[in-house]
Amino acid sequence: MGHDYKLFAAQAIFAGDWCKVAQMRRFRQNGIFRTATCRPTTGDNVRPIRKSNKLDDVCYEIRGPALEKARQMEDDGHKLIKLNIGNLAVFGFDPPDEIMQDMIRNMHGAAGYTDSKGLFAPRKAVMHYTQQKKIAGVRIDDIYLGNGASELIVMAMQGLLNNGDEVLVPAPDYPLWTAAVSLAGGSPIHYVCDEQADWMPDIADMRSKITPNTRAIVVINPNNPTGALYPREILLEIIELARQHGLIIYADEIYDKVLYDGNVHESIASLADDVLFVTLNGLSKNYRSCGYRAGWMVISGDKRHAKDYIEGLNMLASMRLCANAPGQFAIQTALGGYQSIDDLVRPGGRLLKQRDLAYKLLTDIPGVSCVKPKAALYMFPRLDPAMYPIADDQQFICELLAEEKVLLVQGTGFNWIAPDHFRLVFLPNSDDLTDACGRIARFLDGYRRRHAR
């Protein structure tokens, strides 16, 4: 073997192939000498760099192909009305001034790493908030701060799931949940929310989909994309299913203050102490602070059997070092200050007026129906398939974008079961919202005529 090494090394040196020389030296040092050639770095033989197989089942249509088409149109000089993302600041919904001022005052202390779970003061503020929500037994150590709730959703799934594990996720859902389950190696199993029952979870359907592989139930309440708000009796039925089958309940409550018509949100984690709950929330929606990336995750309920899972969460929190410090500094002031969201959702408030306007304009269109949202920032209207025979709702959305320069998200992007819905954000001012809905109505009128039977 030594003779072979000298021979091939000499040939490589003579040829000036120093890459092969270095490679053979490594092989010899490791006791694995073999002839090998370096893969060329230029030319037609370059191996394509492909994404991980872990991403094969991951999809996030809110920022999907239609958005790419929209960006291209904007680059070409077209002005669009974007009703695809609940990004409040771009529509003139600014964060409270005291939050911004407090972040600025604390910026000198934001240069270093914080504790991996977050600074003490904002976590204590979150603990007090859980007490206001009547979630019992939460300690500082049960609270994790993150770069938005989205980061913590992914972390929670990574810490829980093995290949083949199943998680019950609503249909329609906020698609990050489905994507996070898939990325972690799990299988998202979608339980139906019933449009005829104001988008309430179908408990019988949920029950029928529990198997020995089921690990958890995801509850998005208030719901994105439907705007549904779940009453106590529904929440108690979900808890009972989790209790019977030993499942974790993940509660996404990011819209828990964006409530209309005097509705009140009840946290599912406040209704039992013998089930493990993971509750996620943040500043993005209630405090119009999407870009601050300030969210939190709270572990509550029966934690005795979850020590290993919690250890995994601690490990993952440490691996990402910490959440951004400026966003953490915003939390205490936000939770303890004046709740200006109330001014936006009460009678005369901008969000309430725009919800009512969007609802009327959409439901006045022939063949369009919609459950009026009780919460959140979205409409999820249905298009009568007899009038709008849509086979591919992504193509439908792209056609609307091309013809009327209005950007929406198709219903199947939220894992809905049929191509007969879309989601609309009602954040633009009344004039722009009226313009957008008028364009949608014009497009649908043409679509009906083209597909008339």
Give the location of each predicted region.
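Conserved core segment of the aminotransferase class I/II
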Residues: 26, 270-349, 359-361, 444
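PLP-dependent enzyme catalytic core of the Aspartate aminotransferase-like
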Residues: 208, 389-391, 395, 399-408, ...
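Helix C-cap/helix->beta junction micro-motif
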Residues: 76, 184, 244-245, 275, ...
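Conserved glycine-rich beta-strand-loop-beta hairpin in the small C-terminal domain of fold type I
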Residues: 332, 348-359, 370-384
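Active-site phosphate-binding strand-loop segment of PLP-dependent enzymes
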Residues: 189, 194-265
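Conserved PLP-anchoring active-site segment centered on the Schiff-base-forming lysine
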Residues: 159-181
